[in-house]
Structure formats: structure tokens, C-alpha cells
A protein has these predicted regions:
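RNA pseudouridine synthases
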Residues: 1-265
């Protein structure tokens, strides 16, 4: 509703006509005062250019309206301090993101040169990003690739979906363990679209356990989707050495698997 033509809010596909009166209202930008906070983040690797940090489940990556404290950025500002500035004041050091209720590892850039190199690696699809996920249903094959474009859900702008005019999205997966009603899988991202694994697994009929947005109603004792970014691998932006870090499953995910194994026994 920020653009009006002849006093009326118009749709994005409106074609401007001669003598139309166009009024654009500038959105008020609130400069948030983002403060460093001691959140005791686990840092898996750090040197003068890059860091690999663990984001626990339930933590937002960067500040946004209503979330100005307790974010990964607040913790990074306290523990790392030197962070790249390319993404602005509310996203220092942030090269890529994972969802609030997904746990796991993220690359962090400590200067702009490192930031650009890491982004280039993401764009050229050379960063290794592997996730562990628990899905509903029993996947009959041992591995597969989902190549389906993702964009905004036309019926619900707050969620994503596989859509014809979406951006390229490719997810590779392989089965780690079969259960009676569930399958434990490892997913490797070739692209990094919003909610990619969650949308793709729903698309092929195996939605993530606990997913409040794309899954069925809650049936197991876990808050949020059972998804963990356990492996990150990339080339160091300065030394060009290969760095790969692994993070074990969080306790709630491990407990969930143990409960299912006991139930199936």
C-alpha cells in the first residue's frame, strides 16, 4: 500500500497511463539499537577472516521488528566483535541463514573480503551443506534428488511453495534409517532457498516431523521441525584451505529418535 495512483492503492501489474498521478510513500525505517549480548554461542572454528558458529533451535539469526535481542547477531557482536558490514547494521557477518527452529552450523564473515568470497562460493554451489531431517512416511528408495523451483505461496504469502515461476531449487537426499512411520534422511543443498528442505519434502509427500508450517498436526514430542544443519564445508576465503565442521544432533532430536526406536522395537 505504499504506491497509490490517482488516490488508490494499485496492484503490481498496473500499467501506468498518461496523466496518472502517482504518490509513493516512503516506508519509515527504524534504526534499531542492536546491542552485544553474552549468549554463550558455541564457536566451532575462528580465525581472523571467518568463523563457524552453532545456532541453537529457537534462536533467530538476525534482528527484525519484534526481535531485537537474543538473536545470533547479538551473540556474535559480543563474542566475535569484528564482523563484515556488507549486510548492514542488523546483519553483520551474516552470509547465509537457517530457520529459527532449525539448529546447526553457519559460516560467519569477519571482514568484507571474506564475506564476498563466501557468497561467491554459495552462488557457485561449492559450499557443502548437509542437514539431518526426520520425515513422516517411509521413503521407499535409498536416495533421490528433488529439482523443483520455489517461490512465495500465492495463497499464503507467509509461506513458500513449489511454483512454476519460482527460483531454481535442488535438494539431494539419502536415507539414513527407516522406521515404521518415519524416515531419517540426510539432505544436501545445492541451492539455498527459503524453507527449501521443508518445502521440497512436503512436495514429494514426506513432510518434516514437527514442522508447524508445512507438516501435519503435531504428533511427536518436539518443538518445531526436526531439522539440523550438521555439516558445513567451504574453502577458506584467504588461505584457500578446505574447512569442514560437524555438529552432532541436539538432545531433543536424539531423544525423539530414541523414543521412536523404542516404540518400534
Amino acid at each position: 500500500g505504499l504506491v497509490k495512483v490517482n488516490g488508490k492503492v494499485i496492484k503490481s501489474n498496473y500499467k501506468v497511463k498518461l496523466n496518472d498521478k502517482i504518490v509513493v510513500t516512503e516506508k519509515e525505517v527504524v534504526e534499531a539499537d542492536i546491542k552485544p549480548e553474552n549468549l554463550n554461542l558455541d564457536i566451532y572454528y575462528e580465525d581472523e577472516d571467518v568463523a563457524v558458529v552453532y545456532k541453537p533451535k529457537g534462536m533467530v539469526v538476525h534482528p527484525s521488528p519484534g526481535h531485537y535481542s537474543g538473536t545470533l547477531v547479538n551473540g556474535l557482536m559480543y563474542q566475535i566483535k569484528d564482523l563484515s558490514g556488507i549486510n548492514g547494521e542488523i546483519r553483520p557477518g551474516i552470509v547465509h541463514r537457517i530457520d529459527k527452529d532449525t539448529s546447526g552450523l553457519l559460516m560467519v564473515a569477519k571482514n568484507d573480503v571474506a564475506h564476498r568470497h563466501l557468497v561467491e562460493q554459495l552462488m557457485s554451489k561449492t559450499v557443502k551443506r548437509k542437514y539431518t531431517a526426520l520425515v513422516h512416511g517411509n521413503i521407499p528408495h535409498d536416495y533421490g534428488t528433488i529439482d523443483a523451483p520455489i517461490g512465495r505461496n500465492k495463497n499464503d504469502r507467509q509461506s513458500m511453495a513449489v511454483v512454476d515461476d519460482g527460483k531454481e531449487a535442488v535438494t539431494h537426499f539419502n536415507v539414513l534409517e527407516h522406521f515404521k512411520d518415519y524416515t531419517l534422511i540426510e539432505c544436501q543443498l545445492e541451492t539455498g532457498r527459503t524453507h527449501q528442505i521443508r518445502v521440497h519434502m512436503k512436495y514429494i509427500g514426506y513432510p518434516l516431523v514437527g514442522d508447524p508450517k508445512y507438516g501435519p498436526k503435531k504428533t511427536l514430542d518436539i518443538d518445531g521441525q526436526a531439522l539440523h544443519a550438521g555439516i558445513i564445508g567451504f574453502e577458506h576465503p584467504v588461505t584457500h584451505e578446505y574447512i569442514e565442521k560437524h555438529a552432532t544432533l541436539p538432545n531433543d532430536f536424539e531423544k525423539l529418535l530414541d523414543d521412536i526406536r523404542r516404540r518400534d522395537a
